[in-house]
C-alpha cells in the first residue's frame, strides 16, 4: 500500500468513527462570506506541522499566528492542512485562521472524498477546497466541483499526470494545481509540472505546487506558464520568503512570462516522453508515457553553431536546442546569427 493509500484509508476510518468533521465542533454559523482564492499575485502559503516526506517541520506551530506572518508579508491566500495523522493538522486550525483573519482566502487542503466533505469545509470557513483528481472518478470530480461552486467556494483541482488531465477535462475547473510531488513516492521533480501544463486545453489558471524554495523556482514556474505557486515547508521555515515570491509574480518578474523558455523546453521533453500536447478543444486522444517509466529520449543540445546552415541541419537531425558562443572563441558566432535562424522551431541558447 502506498503512502497516499494509507492516508486515504486512515481518513475513511476517521469519518466512519467520528463523522466528516472528525470530532471538530463547527461554528454554528459561517461568519464571513467566501473570499476570492488565489487572486493575483497568486502566492499561496501553507500551514503544516509535518509531512510524510519531511517528518517534523514545525510541530508547535500555531496556525493563526503563522497565517498572520504570511499576511503581514503580503500573502492573501493560505492553505491549511487539516489531515491529522500524517500532516499534524485539523479543521480547528482552519477555523482559527478564518476567525482571526476573515479577509484571508483560505484553502482546505486534505484528502476530500464526497459532498459532505465540501459542506463541512464551507461551514468551517474555507473559501476554497483542494480536490485531488487521482482520488476521484471524473463524475465525482465534476460533482464536487459543482458543489463547491454552489456554496461560493473555489475548487482547486490537483493533477499529477496526463491521466488526471483527462479526468478533469469534463469538469474543466477554473483553477488547476499541478504537483511536482509524486503522491505514491513523495519524491519531487520540479520539471514535471512544466511538462503537464501544455496538456491543459481549457481556460484555467494553473498553480505550481510543491518544491518551491526560492524566487528562482517561482520565476521558473512563471516562465512555464503558471499563474502562481503553492509553497509549504519553505514558507513555514522562512516566512520572509513570501515577499520574494510575490516579487516573482509581480511586475519585476514579468520578463519570465514574456520569455517562456522553460515552458517551451519542458513541453518538448513532454513530447519526447509521449505526453499528448494541447489540442484545439478536441482532447488529447492518448495518454502516452507515465511517471515511473524510462524516458524514451533525452533533450539534445548542439553547441558552437556558427552558420544558419549548421543550425538548420542540427534541427533536421533532431536537436532540441542550438547554442551560440559570443565570447572570444574560434567558434564565435556573428551577433545577428540567432536572428537569422529565428524561424527554426528548436530553442536558441547564447
Name each region found by the language model:
Residues 108-109, 131-132, 179, 208-209, ...:
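Thr-Gly-centered strand-to-loop micro-motif
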Residues 200-201, 342:
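Short, conserved loop/helix-junction motifs that constitute active-site signature segments
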Residues 117-135, 141, 147:
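A short alpha/beta connector and helix-capping loop motif
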Amino acid at each position: 500500500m502506498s503512502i497516499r493509500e494509507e492516508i486515504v484509508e486512515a481518513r475513511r476510518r476517521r469519518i466512519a468513527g467520528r463523522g466528516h468533521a472528525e470530532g471538530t465542533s463547527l461554528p454554528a454559523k459561517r461568519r464571513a462570506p467566501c473570499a476570492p482564492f488565489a487572486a493575483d499575485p497568486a502566492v499561496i502559503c501553507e500551514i503544516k506541522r509535518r509531512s510524510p516526506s519531511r517528518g517534523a517541520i514545525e510541530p508547535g506551530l500555531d496556525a493563526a499566528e503563522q497565517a498572520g506572518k504570511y499576511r503581514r508579508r503580503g500573502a492573501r491566500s493560505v492553505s491549511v492542512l487539516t489531515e491529522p495523522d500524517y500532516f499534524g493538522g485539523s479543521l480547528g486550525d482552519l477555523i482559527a485562521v478564518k476567525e482571526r483573519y476573515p479577509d484571508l482566502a483560505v484553502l482546505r487542503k486534505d484528502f476530500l472524498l464526497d459532498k459532505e466533505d465540501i459542506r463541512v469545509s464551507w461551514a468551517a470557513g474555507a473559501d476554497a477546497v483542494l480536490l485531488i483528481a487521482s482520488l476521484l472518478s471524473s463524475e465525482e470530480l465534476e460533482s464536487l466541483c459543482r458543489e463547491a461552486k454552489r456554496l461560493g467556494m473555489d475548487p482547486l483541482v490537483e493533477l499529477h499526470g496526463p491521466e488526471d488531465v483527462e479526468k478533469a477535462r469534463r469538469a474543466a475547473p477554473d483553477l488547476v494545481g499541478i504537483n511536482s510531488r509524486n503522491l505514491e513516492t513523495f519524491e519531487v521533480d520540479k520539471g514535471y509540472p512544466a511538462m503537464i501544463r501544455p496538456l491543459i486545453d481549457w481556460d484555467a489558471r494553473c498553480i505550481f505546487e510543491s518544491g518551491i524554495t526560492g524566487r528562482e523556482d517561482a520565476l521558473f514556474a512563471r516562465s512555464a506558464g503558471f499563474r502562481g505557486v503553492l509553497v509549504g515547508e519553505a514558507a513555514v521555515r522562512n516566512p520572509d520568503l513570501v515577499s520574494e515570491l510575490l516579487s516573482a509574480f509581480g511586475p519585476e518578474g514579468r520578463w519570465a512570462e514574456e520569455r517562456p523558455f522553460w515552458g517551451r523546453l519542458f513541453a518538448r521533453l513532454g513530447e519526447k516522453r509521449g505526453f499528448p500536447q494541447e489540442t484545439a478543444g478536441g482532447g488529447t486522444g492518448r495518454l502516452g508515457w507515465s511517471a515511473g517509466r524510462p524516458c524514451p529520449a533525452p533533450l539534445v543540445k548542439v553547441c558552437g553553431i556558427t552558420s544558419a546552415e549548421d543550425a538548420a541541419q542540427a534541427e533536421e537531425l533532431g536537436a532540441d536546442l542550438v547554442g551560440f558562443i559570443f565570447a572570444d572563441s574560434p567558434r564565435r558566432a556573428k551577433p545577428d546569427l540567432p536572428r537569422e535562424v529565428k524561424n527554426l522551431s528548436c530553442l536558441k541558447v547564447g
